[in-house]
Amino acid sequence: MYNMYYCKRNKYISNYSFGKNNKGHITIKHRQGLFIKSSQLKNTNYNYIFKKNIFNIINYNNKKIIKLQILKKIIDYKLQKYIYKVICLNNSLNYQYKYLPITKNTKEGDIIYIGETIELKIGNILPIKKIPCGSWIHNIEHNPTKGAVFVKNSKISAFLIYIGKKYVTIKLPSGEIRLLNKNVFCILGELNIIPLFLKKNKAGFNRLLGKRPKVRGVAMNACDHPHGGGEGKNSIGRSSVYSPWGTISKGIITRKSKKYSKKLILKNRKKND
């Protein structure tokens, strides 16, 4: 059906640095080159509704509608799950391929729309202010035109609680209740991820995914790790667990106390005791 068109593939141009900097020094441990370069879930920003300068908010067109069609399920080896491969049916996008998470009650061959003036249908992508309260949503943006951040890879979707003048209130799968800008885009419906259940029957499978072996700190020398050194199997010898750089890695708050989005969080997430 699509042989008559030139389908521009949305290729994955990898900026994978193998865990090293420009001098060849290791900056990220347990990382190596990729062999399986699968199509990852990278099309998380809904900039299809913009003109050529997609990052310029002045060029926003409210009446523009993008039409997508689901082609097939494909395997994402990196995330180890299935995702949908869709094609844009608008001439302005040159029939590009995109990738989206799987929504419940959608199947291959369905038509999906993106825009502000579209109907409320499961799988459609529209502003969160157009969705009625009490709906399930996923693949949600944090700021308009910046790409989806929330609820991308979990099996439970977010719940829309209230729509106000400037902000909307949602409940995330972690139990956190927070405010969001009402102009952000999201996907209507519940997220349905079908895992692959891949059996990693050998260590070489992880090596193909770009993962190197991990060595315990207790098994290292004292010059390589704070847990290292000693004769035979010794304990850590410290009151807490430390990172390779000598900082405590348990119970330390890493979030900034004066972060700008702190005022948008109404209820913190449930922490494991």
Swiss-Prot record:
Query: One MF term from GO for this chain?
Result: RNA binding
- Record-linked SMART domains: Ribosomal_L2_C
The answer to keyword Glycosyltransferase applying to this record is no
Q: Which GO terms describe its cellular component?
A: apicoplast; mitochondrial large ribosomal subunit
Q: Where in the cell is it found?
A: Plastid, Apicoplast
Q: Which InterPro entries match?
A: Rib_uL2_dom2, Ribosomal_uL2, Ribosomal_uL2_bac/org-type, Ribosomal_uL2_C, Ribosomal_uL2_CS, Ribosomal_uL2_dom3, Translation_prot_SH3-like_sf
Concerning Pfam families, the annotation shows: Ribosomal_L2_C
* SUPFAM superfamilies the UniProt entry points to: Translation proteins SH3-like domain
Gene Ontology terms: biological process: mitochondrial translation
**Gene3D superfamilies (alphabetical):** 2.30.30.30, Ribosomal protein L2, domain 3 (4.10.950.10)
Does the record's keyword annotation contain Plastid? yes
Q: Which UniProt keywords apply?
A: Apicoplast, Plastid, Ribonucleoprotein, Ribosomal protein
Q: Where is it mainly found?
A: plastid
As for family, the record states:
Belongs to the universal ribosomal protein uL2 family.
Subunit info here reads:
Part of the 50S ribosomal subunit.
Q: What is this protein's name?
A: Large ribosomal subunit protein uL2c
